Amino acid sequence: IETLKSAHMEVEFFKFQKAFYTHKRIIILGNGGSNSVASHISQDYMKFHHKKVSILSDPSMITMLTNDFTYDLAYQKFLEYYVEEDTLVIIMSSGGESTNMLNCLEWCEINNVDYGVLTGFKKDNTIRSKAIHALFNYHIDSDSYGVVECVHQIFLHGVV
């Protein structure tokens, strides 16, 4: 409860809301529980907002990309294949230190692709710190995976 009281998501949520409504295509990325959040929210974005949403959760796609390009580059390769004009990439990393998510952030920076990040744990985590041109950069101050992932899901559901 204390974590939620100090969540302070309003400013970053309004930035996210603006980005969400000004992009037709959305790619949502995350590992583990964050990938589950991506899967769930992608359905709502498609159903309620008619957004074109892509996520990397298909086992055969994941194993092909990891086998051919390594796990650290698999999600970046997914972006290379799926990013189109008017795409917003949402990068989630509970701890903000996932190399594969950091590679996606750097790819977005280099290729001028609009993106935003959702992180937790340490306030000065690598992804949060390197998200120079992020349209939104929300951090939840908690070291609990469950709290971070649930708050990220609440944040993303704010437009539903």
Name each model feature, range by range.
Residues 3-23:
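A short, well-structured juxtamembrane/interface segment
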Residues 1-3, 152:
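Charged, low-complexity, helix-prone segments enriched in Lys/Glu/Asp/Gln
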Residues 27-160:
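Glycine-rich phosphate-binding loops that contact phosphosugars or nucleotide phosphates
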